[in-house]
């Protein structure tokens, strides 16, 4: 699992060839590191080797939240992060999860995707974002999709990671996550007052 702050996580895993996933399986859930929820990943590639099958998957929430209709115009005024997030998630199947107390801010969401609005909230309040899934242990069905905002995940260890002269391998990866299938055209955005002038 490759995890970065406020970006889609990536999951790579492999199975023996005889345990290859059915072609109708598109998503994989793994337990969250802290808590009883799960992280959900969408399988984006399958690479069949001699005796193994390697899979690559990305966190599915990012794609889903980009696919909802655009927010045309919401102007939250003097709200905390939870209140803004609740407005943004109103027409989705996602809800508030754990959201830390934040100060209050004002902003504007104008012709942006749900995901762009969430990222604007994250930047505005300087918080860290995760998406979690709740699963019924008996029926194995998804019962909830949560958006969580933390002041800080994990802890600071003072350790530093670098790569340089002792590099052993380099891997080239191609990514089709930000593929655009539709565009929304907009005009100049001139504000018009109450009188209709011809």
Predicted segments — roles?
Residues 16-100:
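Surface-exposed cap/loop segments at beta↔alpha junctions
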Residues 153-198:
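Acidic, small/polar-enriched beta strand-loop surface segments
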Residues 8-12, 49-54, 139-146:
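A generic structural signal for beta-strand entry/edge sites
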Residues 127-160, 164-165, 177:
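Extended amphipathic alpha-helical segments with heptad-repeat/coiled-coil character used for oligomerization
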Residues 16, 58-60, 150-152, 186-188:
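Structured loops at beta-to-helix junctions and adjacent beta-edge loops in soluble globular domains
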Residues 94-107, 138-145:
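Short, conserved phosphate-binding/catalytic loop or strand-edge motifs used
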Residues 13, 57, 70-97, 108-135, ...:
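Amphipathic, non-transmembrane alpha-helical segments in extracytoplasmic/periplasmic proteins
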Residues 1-6:
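Short beta-strand/loop turn elements enriched in aromatics
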């Amino acid at each position: 699992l490759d995890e970065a702050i406020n970006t889609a996580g990536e999951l790579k895993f492999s199975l023996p060839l005889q345990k290859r996933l059915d072609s109708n399986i598109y998503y994989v859930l793994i337990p969250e590191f802290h808590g009883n929820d799960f992280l959900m990943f969408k399988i984006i590639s399958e690479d069949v080797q001699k005796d193994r099958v390697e899979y690559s998957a990305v966190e599915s929430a990012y794609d889903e939240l980009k696919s909802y209709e655009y927010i045309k115009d919401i102007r939250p005024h003097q709200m905390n992060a939870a209140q803004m997030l609740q407005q943004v998630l109103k027409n989705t199947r996602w809800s508030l999860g754990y959201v830390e107390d934040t100060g209050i801010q004002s902003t504007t969401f104008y012709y942006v995707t749900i995901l762009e609005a969430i990222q604007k909230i994250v930047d505005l309040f300087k918080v860290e974002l995760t998406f979690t899934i709740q699963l019924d242990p008996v029926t194995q069905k998804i019962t909830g999709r949560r958006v969580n905002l933390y002041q800080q995940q994990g802890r600071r260890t003072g350790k530093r990671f670098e790569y340089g002269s002792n590099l052993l391998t380099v891997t080239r990866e191609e990514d089709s996550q930000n593929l655009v299938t539709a565009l929304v055209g907009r005009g100049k955005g001139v504000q018009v007052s109450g009188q209709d002038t011809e």
